[in-house]
A protein has these predicted regions:
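Amphipathic, Lys/Arg-enriched alpha-helical "gate/interface" segment within cytosolic domains
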Residues: 2-130
Length: 130
């Protein structure tokens, strides 16, 4: 993992290789890592997420996202999810709605994440500590 400061936001970027994130306990570990590095946002490569994350009926996406949001840590899923989105209207809608907000983003790559961090935040998505 590495830490980057992007447009005034401290970002914890997970490595492509590593254990899959599949449970609320894994999300709690992300929170701990983010806090220990004073990161506001955790960027997770799509390859690190359990495939069940993208099957919304499992509830895993909600559990993981909620755990981070509870601790005011934002989440960015980084990578190509076009194949799984094409197979699920519900997931497509979830991704679209998430990308409208400021807590969970699905981005194609780190360049898109950096561009999102430059854009103004939606109302109600105050930065931690503000």
């Amino acid at each position: 993992m590495r830490i980057d400061e992007q447009h005034g936001v401290r970002v914890l970027l997970l490595d492509l290789e590593g254990a899959r994130i599949s449970t609320p306990d894994d999300a709690a570990d992300l929170v701990g890592s983010a806090w220990s590095h004073q990161a506001e946002l955790v960027a997770v490569p799509v390859e690190r997420l359990d495939p069940k994350f993208f099957r919304l009926k499992t509830g895993i996406a909600g559990e993981i996202t909620q755990k981070l949001v509870n601790y005011r840590i934002r989440l960015a899923v980084v990578g190509d999810i076009s194949d799984v989105v094409a197979k699920s209207d519900a997931l497509r809608d979830f991704v679209r709605e998430s990308n409208r907000g400021g807590q969970l983003w699905f981005v194609a790559d780190e360049a898109e994440l950096a561009a999102r961090l430059v854009a103004p935040r939606p109302v109600g998505d105050a930065a931690p500590g503000s």
